[in-house]
Design a protein with these regions (language model features):
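A generic alpha-to-beta junction signature in SAM-dependent methyltransferases
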Residues: 43-45, 68-69, 142
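Conserved Class I S-adenosyl-L-methionine
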Residues: 2, 12, 20, 24, ...
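Conserved catalytic/acceptor-binding region of the Class I
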Residues: 132, 139, 143, 147-219, ...
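Conserved hydrophobic residues forming the short capping helix/wall of the S-adenosyl-L-methionine
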Residues: 69, 91, 169, 198, ...
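A short acidic, Gly/Pro-enriched loop at the edge of an enzyme's catalytic core
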Residues: 107-118
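A short SAM/SAH-binding and catalytic strip from SAM-dependent methyltransferases
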Residues: 117-131, 154
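Conserved class I S-adenosyl-L-methionine
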Residues: 1-47, 60-64, 83-86, 93
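Class I SAM-dependent methyltransferase SAM/SAH-binding core
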Residues: 50-109, 133
């Protein structure tokens, strides 16, 4: 793998988090898949396009891009070796010869200049250590007139999964809700911030549109609670908790999720931004 600057993210995604996402890739696609349609509509991938998928994870979006670019190609890049192993296996199983994957840090990866017509990303760009440098590096990989389209987390207050997690505060040290622009998952949640970052990175025709979609977390409240507690912020909150506290936290979260359960399982509103830009 080429040099990495986002070392904290690399450690996380090559440890427990990466293994969890690789092992549960279908479930994470059920959580995030409601945003695929607005993302790929914005990307407008053509049949001969060469597509770069940033932070591709287990490769769902890379495979979607490869199908749309049937006479082109799609390259997924990610820090996580466990997720890339899953991505390669899934693409091979689907017979997608035009999908490939590379382990690397998109912020500094030595992409071939002007090699791609489109760059896409689903919920990965929020974690860049230096977003201006990262997006500038991606711009260099796009041909003149090439398109950037990504979805990132939107207004924290409109993400119901985050609100539900506050129920854990009865038992665990839940931090205050994040504000748009805070480092991490919501670092690009403010449209003006996104426009500023992309303008500084050299892009033109920048757009940011708020979208919402249901996120499917589990077949019932108990299943969804176990899944939410198995990864991400909730998993870290449980670190160090004794068994009794962890059990009470799970029971409380299950109760908070019951109002969101229906015949199709537990669905919570997710809010994101669909961002588009052009490389001059």
């Amino acid at each position: 793998m080429h040099p990495v600057v986002n070392t904290e993210q690399a450690q996380a995604w090559n440890g427990y988090e990466g293994d969890h996402w690789a092992d549960h890739h279908d479930r994470w696609n059920a959580v995030n898949g409601g945003f695929d349609e607005p993302l790929f509509t914005a990307a407008a991938i053509g049949p001969r396009d060469h597509v770069l998928d940033i932070g591709c994870g287990a490769g769902r979006t890379t495979r979607l891009a490869a199908r749309q670019a049937a006479d082109g190609r799609a390259l997924g890049i990610d820090l996580s070796a466990p997720m890339l192993a899953r991505a390669r296996a899934e693409a091979a199983g689907e017979g997608l010869a035009n999908a490939a994957f590379v382990q690397g840090d998109a912020q500094v990866h030595p992409f071939a200049p002007a090699a791609f017509d489109v760059a896409v990303s689903r919920f990965a760009t929020m974690f860049f250590g230096d977003p201006v440098a990262a997006f500038a590096n991606i711009r260099g990989a796009l041909r003149p007139g090439g398109r950037l389209a990504f979805v990132c987390m939107g207004d924290p207050g409109r993400n119901d999964w985050l609100r539900v997690l506050t129920a854990l505060g009865e038992h665990l040290p839940v931090p205050p809700p994040p504000s748009p622009g805070d480092p991490g998952m919501f670092s690009l949640a403010e449209p003006d911030r996104v426009r500023e970052v992309l303008a500084d990175a050299g892009y033109a025709d920048i757009g940011a549109t708020a979208v919402e979609a249901p996120m499917h977390w589990g077949r019932d409240a108990a299943d969804a609670a176990r899944f939410l507690l198995g990864s991400g912020p909730a998993h870290h909150l449980l670190a160090g908790a004794d068994r009794a506290t962890a059990r009470r936290a799970e029971d409380t979260l299950t109760a908070a999720l019951r109002p969101h359960a229906g015949p199709a399982g537990v669905r919570l509103r997710g809010a994101a931004l669909v961002v588009t830009a052009v490389a001059p």
